[in-house]
Regions:
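Acidic/polar hotspots within intrinsically disordered regions
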Residues: 1-4
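Left-handed beta-helix
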Residues: 15, 20-21, 27, 32-33, ...
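Extracellular beta-strand/beta-solenoid scaffold signature
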Residues: 15-17, 45-48
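Extended basic-aromatic, gly/pro-enriched interface segments that bind polyanionic ligands
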Residues: 42
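Short, solvent-exposed loop/turn segments at secondary-structure boundaries
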Residues: 49, 152-153, 210
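Conserved beta-strand-loop-alpha-helix hinge in the C-terminal portion
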Residues: 194-218
Length: 220
Protein backbone atom coordinates (compact mmCIF):
# COMPACT_ATOMS: atom_id res chain seq x y z
CA UNK A 1 0.00 0.00 0.00
CA UNK A 2 0.94 3.67 -0.24
CA UNK A 3 0.95 5.36 3.16
CA UNK A 4 -0.64 3.88 6.29
CA UNK A 5 -3.62 2.00 4.87
CA UNK A 6 -5.38 -0.62 6.97
CA UNK A 7 -6.87 -3.82 5.57
CA UNK A 8 -8.50 -6.76 7.37
CA UNK A 9 -9.93 -8.48 4.30
CA UNK A 10 -9.19 -12.12 3.56
CA UNK A 11 -10.03 -11.84 -0.13
CA UNK A 12 -8.27 -8.66 -1.16
CA UNK A 13 -6.82 -9.19 -4.64
CA UNK A 14 -4.07 -6.61 -4.54
CA UNK A 15 -1.36 -7.38 -7.08
CA UNK A 16 0.16 -3.98 -7.83
CA UNK A 17 -3.01 -2.12 -6.85
CA UNK A 18 -2.26 1.18 -5.10
CA UNK A 19 -4.04 1.77 -1.81
CA UNK A 20 -3.48 5.41 -0.96
CA UNK A 21 -2.97 7.11 2.39
CA UNK A 22 -4.93 6.01 5.43
CA UNK A 23 -7.53 3.97 3.56
CA UNK A 24 -9.49 1.49 5.66
CA UNK A 25 -10.76 -1.70 4.02
CA UNK A 26 -13.19 -3.93 5.89
CA UNK A 27 -13.37 -7.69 6.26
CA UNK A 28 -13.97 -10.22 3.48
CA UNK A 29 -13.75 -7.75 0.60
CA UNK A 30 -12.82 -8.49 -2.99
CA UNK A 31 -10.93 -5.59 -4.55
CA UNK A 32 -9.64 -5.91 -8.10
CA UNK A 33 -5.98 -5.20 -8.74
CA UNK A 34 -6.94 -2.42 -11.19
CA UNK A 35 -9.00 -0.46 -8.66
CA UNK A 36 -7.68 2.84 -7.30
CA UNK A 37 -8.46 3.00 -3.59
CA UNK A 38 -8.25 6.30 -1.70
CA UNK A 39 -6.97 8.20 -4.74
CA UNK A 40 -5.95 11.73 -3.70
CA UNK A 41 -8.37 14.49 -4.64
CA UNK A 42 -7.16 17.82 -6.02
CA UNK A 43 -6.23 19.34 -2.65
CA UNK A 44 -4.13 16.29 -1.76
CA UNK A 45 -2.14 15.83 -4.96
CA UNK A 46 0.98 17.51 -3.60
CA UNK A 47 0.83 15.87 -0.17
CA UNK A 48 3.07 13.06 0.97
CA UNK A 49 1.53 9.60 1.06
CA UNK A 50 1.11 9.56 4.83
CA UNK A 51 -0.82 12.85 4.66
CA UNK A 52 -3.48 11.54 2.27
CA UNK A 53 -6.68 10.75 4.16
CA UNK A 54 -7.63 7.72 2.09
CA UNK A 55 -11.13 6.24 1.83
CA UNK A 56 -13.23 3.71 3.75
CA UNK A 57 -14.73 0.53 2.28
CA UNK A 58 -17.13 -1.54 4.35
CA UNK A 59 -17.08 -5.28 5.01
CA UNK A 60 -17.94 -7.82 2.30
CA UNK A 61 -17.69 -5.32 -0.55
CA UNK A 62 -16.89 -6.19 -4.17
CA UNK A 63 -14.89 -3.44 -5.87
CA UNK A 64 -14.08 -3.95 -9.56
CA UNK A 65 -11.76 -1.69 -11.62
CA UNK A 66 -12.62 1.94 -10.93
CA UNK A 67 -11.72 4.78 -8.58
CA UNK A 68 -12.69 5.66 -5.02
CA UNK A 69 -11.29 9.05 -4.07
CA UNK A 70 -9.83 9.99 -0.73
CA UNK A 71 -12.38 10.90 2.00
CA UNK A 72 -15.14 8.85 0.30
CA UNK A 73 -16.94 6.25 2.43
CA UNK A 74 -18.58 3.11 1.02
CA UNK A 75 -20.81 1.04 3.27
CA UNK A 76 -20.90 -2.70 3.83
CA UNK A 77 -21.68 -5.01 0.90
CA UNK A 78 -21.07 -2.36 -1.74
CA UNK A 79 -20.91 -3.89 -5.23
CA UNK A 80 -19.55 -2.17 -8.31
CA UNK A 81 -19.28 -2.75 -12.01
CA UNK A 82 -16.26 -1.62 -14.04
CA UNK A 83 -14.97 1.92 -14.60
CA UNK A 84 -17.03 3.49 -11.84
CA UNK A 85 -16.02 6.68 -10.00
CA UNK A 86 -16.84 7.84 -6.46
CA UNK A 87 -15.39 11.24 -5.65
CA UNK A 88 -14.26 12.92 -2.44
CA UNK A 89 -16.48 13.55 0.61
CA UNK A 90 -19.20 11.29 -0.75
CA UNK A 91 -20.86 8.82 1.62
CA UNK A 92 -22.64 5.70 0.39
CA UNK A 93 -24.74 3.50 2.68
CA UNK A 94 -24.86 -0.28 3.02
CA UNK A 95 -25.83 -2.74 0.31
CA UNK A 96 -25.59 -0.42 -2.70
CA UNK A 97 -24.91 -1.40 -6.30
CA UNK A 98 -22.88 0.96 -8.52
CA UNK A 99 -23.04 -0.32 -12.09
CA UNK A 100 -20.46 -0.01 -14.84
CA UNK A 101 -19.55 3.59 -15.77
CA UNK A 102 -21.53 5.07 -12.88
CA UNK A 103 -20.16 8.44 -11.75
CA UNK A 104 -20.95 9.87 -8.31
CA UNK A 105 -19.37 13.28 -7.87
CA UNK A 106 -18.13 14.89 -4.67
CA UNK A 107 -20.11 15.77 -1.54
CA UNK A 108 -23.01 13.42 -2.25
CA UNK A 109 -24.92 11.47 0.40
CA UNK A 110 -26.40 8.14 -0.72
CA UNK A 111 -28.64 6.00 1.50
CA UNK A 112 -28.86 2.23 1.95
CA UNK A 113 -29.75 -0.44 -0.64
CA UNK A 114 -29.66 1.83 -3.68
CA UNK A 115 -29.14 0.53 -7.21
CA UNK A 116 -27.49 2.77 -9.80
CA UNK A 117 -27.41 1.14 -13.22
CA UNK A 118 -24.89 1.47 -16.08
CA UNK A 119 -23.92 5.01 -16.97
CA UNK A 120 -25.97 6.83 -14.32
CA UNK A 121 -24.58 10.26 -13.39
CA UNK A 122 -24.95 11.75 -9.89
CA UNK A 123 -23.60 15.33 -9.63
CA UNK A 124 -22.04 17.24 -6.75
CA UNK A 125 -24.16 17.65 -3.63
CA UNK A 126 -26.93 15.20 -4.51
CA UNK A 127 -28.81 13.64 -1.58
CA UNK A 128 -30.37 10.21 -2.19
CA UNK A 129 -32.53 8.29 0.28
CA UNK A 130 -32.87 4.54 0.82
CA UNK A 131 -33.88 1.91 -1.77
CA UNK A 132 -33.57 4.28 -4.72
CA UNK A 133 -33.27 2.85 -8.24
CA UNK A 134 -31.62 4.92 -10.98
CA UNK A 135 -31.75 3.37 -14.44
CA UNK A 136 -29.14 3.20 -17.21
CA UNK A 137 -27.82 6.53 -18.48
CA UNK A 138 -30.13 8.57 -16.27
CA UNK A 139 -28.67 12.01 -15.67
CA UNK A 140 -29.10 14.25 -12.66
CA UNK A 141 -27.97 17.88 -13.02
CA UNK A 142 -27.08 20.74 -10.66
CA UNK A 143 -26.42 23.83 -12.82
CA UNK A 144 -29.07 25.53 -14.97
CA UNK A 145 -26.66 27.73 -16.93
CA UNK A 146 -23.42 25.75 -17.28
CA UNK A 147 -20.36 27.87 -18.16
CA UNK A 148 -22.52 30.85 -19.22
CA UNK A 149 -22.78 32.43 -15.77
CA UNK A 150 -21.07 32.07 -12.42
CA UNK A 151 -21.41 28.47 -11.24
CA UNK A 152 -24.35 28.02 -8.87
CA UNK A 153 -24.68 24.50 -7.53
CA UNK A 154 -28.33 23.53 -7.00
CA UNK A 155 -28.29 19.94 -5.71
CA UNK A 156 -31.12 17.49 -6.20
CA UNK A 157 -32.82 15.59 -3.37
CA UNK A 158 -34.25 12.14 -4.05
CA UNK A 159 -36.36 10.69 -1.26
CA UNK A 160 -36.80 7.03 -0.26
CA UNK A 161 -38.13 4.40 -2.69
CA UNK A 162 -37.90 6.51 -5.83
CA UNK A 163 -37.47 4.76 -9.20
CA UNK A 164 -35.92 6.65 -12.13
CA UNK A 165 -36.08 5.08 -15.59
CA UNK A 166 -33.36 4.89 -18.21
CA UNK A 167 -32.27 8.09 -19.98
CA UNK A 168 -34.36 10.29 -17.68
CA UNK A 169 -33.04 13.78 -16.92
CA UNK A 170 -33.63 15.58 -13.62
CA UNK A 171 -33.06 19.34 -13.68
CA UNK A 172 -31.19 21.22 -10.91
CA UNK A 173 -32.49 21.93 -7.43
CA UNK A 174 -35.50 19.63 -7.53
CA UNK A 175 -36.93 17.28 -4.93
CA UNK A 176 -38.26 13.92 -6.09
CA UNK A 177 -40.80 12.86 -3.48
CA UNK A 178 -40.95 9.53 -1.69
CA UNK A 179 -42.05 6.62 -3.86
CA UNK A 180 -42.19 8.66 -7.06
CA UNK A 181 -41.72 6.86 -10.37
CA UNK A 182 -39.90 8.68 -13.19
CA UNK A 183 -40.56 7.14 -16.61
CA UNK A 184 -37.74 6.38 -19.03
CA UNK A 185 -36.74 9.40 -21.11
CA UNK A 186 -38.65 11.88 -18.96
CA UNK A 187 -37.26 15.40 -18.50
CA UNK A 188 -38.24 16.54 -15.02
CA UNK A 189 -38.38 20.33 -14.56
CA UNK A 190 -40.51 20.61 -11.40
CA UNK A 191 -40.62 18.98 -7.96
CA UNK A 192 -42.33 15.60 -8.12
CA UNK A 193 -44.92 14.88 -5.40
CA UNK A 194 -44.63 11.68 -3.37
CA UNK A 195 -46.09 8.54 -4.96
CA UNK A 196 -46.64 10.16 -8.35
CA UNK A 197 -45.66 9.15 -11.88
CA UNK A 198 -43.68 11.62 -14.00
CA UNK A 199 -43.47 11.04 -17.76
CA UNK A 200 -42.86 13.02 -20.92
CA UNK A 201 -40.78 16.05 -21.96
CA UNK A 202 -41.34 18.18 -20.00
CA UNK A 203 -42.68 15.67 -17.51
CA UNK A 204 -46.30 15.77 -16.41
CA UNK A 205 -47.49 14.13 -13.20
CA UNK A 206 -50.24 11.70 -12.31
CA UNK A 207 -50.95 9.58 -9.26
CA UNK A 208 -49.39 6.14 -9.22
CA UNK A 209 -51.73 3.16 -9.59
CA UNK A 210 -52.32 1.27 -6.36
CA UNK A 211 -50.14 -1.69 -7.39
CA UNK A 212 -47.07 0.61 -7.52
CA UNK A 213 -47.68 2.32 -4.18
CA UNK A 214 -45.18 0.25 -2.23
CA UNK A 215 -41.47 0.38 -1.39
CA UNK A 216 -38.88 -0.71 -3.93
CA UNK A 217 -37.78 -4.31 -3.68
CA UNK A 218 -34.18 -3.49 -2.85
CA UNK A 219 -32.27 -4.82 0.13
CA UNK A 220 -34.53 -7.86 0.50
Amino acid sequence: NDGNASCSSKFLRRGLMPIYGGSIIGKDCFIDSDALIGYPHAKELEKESKEIAGCEIGDESIIRPGSVYSTAKLGEKTRTGHNFLVRENTTIGDGCLLGTNVVIDNDCKIGNYCSFQTGAYIPTGTVVGDRVFIGPNASLTNDNTPVRTEYLCEPITIENDVSIGSNATIMPGLTIGEGAFIAGGAVVTKNVPAWHLAKGCPAVFSKLPDNLKKPNRLGL
